[in-house]
């Protein structure tokens, strides 16, 4: 056998062993790590969420739509207890409720909330109140409605007290 044949065999074997060694390297991450955020890394349970939002006025989807259709000006918090983002946001809502000059209505978006028994038309009508330029972006959402449309809104668990105070300012200036 030729020298070239053996050098090709050794080269192929070397490449194979190099890649085989790379393939057996495993990487793992600590699945219990907590990711810090700009609000809080504390996990908030459902009972604490309910305590944090004490002071909101629960309304049904029918009541919400009636307020919107009659042109009433109001602030609504759309959320639900099982929503991780809503629970994370709830301490900010608690602060806001302590200083709010206006009633804050609460529309339960969860599986057992107002939407669970709503007709398709009611659900469509709800989403139409968030028409251009603002669309419903999920929960938690705090919105100011006037004349049947959202005129000011904030959404997400990174909503700050300042964001909510801006909604109050918009309410006062409408």
UniProtKB/Swiss-Prot annotation:
Keyword annotations: Antibiotic biosynthesis, Bacteriocin biosynthesis, Plasmid
Domain of life, source organism: Bacteria
InterPro entries: PedC_BrcD (IPR005985), Thioredoxin-like_sf (IPR036249)
GO biological process: bacteriocin biosynthetic process
Keyword presence, Lipoprotein: no
Role according to the record: Probably involved in pediocin PA-1 biosynthesis.
Protein name according to UniProt: Pediocin PA-1 biosynthesis protein PedC
Gene name of the encoded protein: pedC
């Amino acid at each position: 056998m030729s020298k070239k044949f053996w050098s090709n065999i050794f080269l192929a074997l070397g490449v194979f062993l190099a890649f085989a060694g790379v393939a057996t390297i495993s990487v793992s991450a600590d699945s219990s790590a907590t990711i810090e955020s700009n609000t809080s890394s504390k996990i908030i349970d459902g009972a604490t969420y309910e305590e944090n939002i004490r002071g909101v006025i629960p309304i049904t989807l029918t009541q919400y739509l009636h307020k919107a259709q009659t042109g009433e000006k109001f602030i609504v918090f759309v959320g639900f207890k099982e929503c991780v983002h809503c629970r994370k946001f709830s301490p900010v809502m608690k602060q806001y409720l302590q200083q709010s000059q206006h009633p804050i209505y609460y529309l339960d978006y969860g599986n057992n909330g107002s939407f669970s028994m709503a007709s398709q038309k009611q659900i469509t009508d709800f989403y139409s109140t968030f028409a251009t330029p603002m669309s419903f972006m999920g929960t938690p959402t705090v919105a100011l409605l006037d004349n049947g449309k959202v005129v000011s809104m904030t959404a997400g668990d990174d909503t700050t007290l300042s964001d909510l105070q801006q909604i109050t300012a918009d309410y006062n200036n409408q």
